[in-house]
Amino acid sequence: MLDPQFEDLLRVLIRHPSVVAAEHSYFRVLQRELEERGANVTWYEGVLVAQGSDPSSCMFSAHADRHGLMCTGPNEFQFAAFVAGNRTDLLNNSVSEQLMGKVIGRYENQAVFAYEPWSGMYRGKGIITNSRVCPYRNNVIFDVDGLQSAVAGTPVAFQDNLVFNDGRIEAQLDNVLTIAALVHLFTLGFKGTAFFTAEEEAGKSWRYLLEWFRRFGGSTNQLYVLDTSPYDTIEAANEQLIVLREKDANAKFNEAATNKIQRLCEEAGISFMYKDKFVEQQNVKLEALGEKPKSIGSTEMGRIISASNGLVDGTTIQIPTTGYHTTAESASIESVAAFISLISKLALDET
């Protein structure tokens, strides 16, 4: 069972849009929810910082942005993360064919709505009818019926609601699920610091975090980054309640912090697995079949460790999900409850 207060909060946050690079109105919503729970909230470029009475006791981070579209011209819409990340041939940093292949067709018949990026004001609704690759810009273009009046720079979010289905919750969970968990921590009396970052899906959030730590952090700073972790099937996702990592494609994580999470899981009887080890084991099988190995993945934690030269260290805690980056992404209720229990115990353990 989920705490009714958490469930109510999650429903509210899911309904508010937060498209990559258009998170400002969502930060307003988070500010209200956090201040109602007693947090001191400060805005910086690309990051909303919420602090309790003992800010240095424990620090968590979660990215606030979600996938969506951006209007880039008359009746023209592109994948917002690609636009925000400047991932076009114009800068010799094109989107890979593999990545474009995942996006094309994924959102067909998806209901969407446009909003004003600063206020969140509703600007009309539509439906995605088609997506294709533009050969001139090597980027994905979406056809949206109903938003012909949208002007360039208008974000377009996926229409979404929280659904309960056979012991699982479904919505565009990445990353509103861990955002809600972080806000809920303040309901439970959290005294530390929570960072809510922008543009993670475009690979930029770590820059905003690092800038804050360079300005306000100590000589060393331990951070726990919260996120979802994708699996191909519900069966695979259900094999563990929590996903940990020792590293990602960018850097090794803090061993002591990772071991602490493992210890807390073991003490509470929470099943877990290491995603990097899981992928590496899969790659052994793929290579034996002559197939291309998969990447162990790139995370906000790895990016900031790699770039900070020892200033920021830490590890990740993730919720296993299926239906990645869609409005049908799902997580087991048991996993979500275990996740909230785990980070609550971690916060208490750090104080």
Name each model feature, range by range:
Residues 1-351:
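N-terminal hydrophobic/helix-forming segments and targeting peptides
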